[in-house]
Amino acid sequence: MLDLYIEEIYKRIEKIKSTQLEKIKQAAHLITESLISEDSVFHVFGCGHSHMAAEELFYRAGGLACVNAILPSELMLHEGALKSSYYERNEEIIKLIFDRYELRKGECIIIVSHSGRNGAPVEAAIDAKRRGLHVVALTSTEYKQKTFSRHSSGKFLEDVADIVIDNCGPYGDAVLTVEKEDIKISFSPLSTVLNTVILNMLEAEIITNMLEKNMSPPVFLSGNIEGAEEHNLKLIEKYKKRLRHL
């Protein structure tokens, strides 16, 4: 099973490479263009385990400082797993959450949801567009073919977003299956691995774009190397008013 899981990761990443590069480049271009202003940021939002995607890009060694992670306590697993599942299906919670953050017209938000079907992530895309933001969705497009939306509009996340990146993950997330007698067990999810790969590809392309435009990418250094503290403090000072969770 160890080998099978690794093989599935390789296979899915190869599919991302062969089918999603243009979408990732489009998203990177859109985000780069939104970062022209001195204190512009882009935002990342996800519910449940997908919130780890926001954490992956936020305050990260080797990552951009201009990333605002939207991490509301209502949707965090460590604040109550059952509560987070309840609110993930609740579209009304989104306006209350987004009102806590400074989301400027013309900025970009990445919304991460493996299924793309629940009320909160779909409403997040709708609300963000209402506020004038550009929406990039990171989701598995397989779900729309196999199930229904839980949002009152009947829409999936991919129906609302400006750019849709398919993480090429499976329906149900779990990728390995064992059948024994009358029992069928599916296990070993992929979405966190695939989302992390895609988001770091996206960020690498954003940084490349910034360099090509003679912009200075505000990249954090690892706090465990010499000289990093002074460098990072300058970036923190620059963006601290925009990043709620610093």
Swiss-Prot record:
Gene3D superfamilies membership: Glucose-6-phosphate isomerase like protein, domain 1 (3.40.50.10490)
CDD domains in the cross-refs: SIS_RpiR
GO molecular function annotation: carbohydrate derivative binding
PROSITE patterns according to UniProt: SIS
Domain of life: Bacteria
Residue span(s) of domain SIS: 31-212
Any one of the GO BP annotations: carbohydrate derivative metabolic process
Protein family (similarity comment): Belongs to the UPF0309 family.
HAMAP family found in the cross-reference section: UPF0309
Protein name in UniProt: UPF0309 protein TTE0306
Biological source species: Caldanaerobacter subterraneus subsp. tengcongensis (strain DSM 15242 / JCM 11007 / NBRC 100824 / MB4)
Record lineage: Bacteria, Bacillati, Bacillota, Clostridia, Thermoanaerobacterales
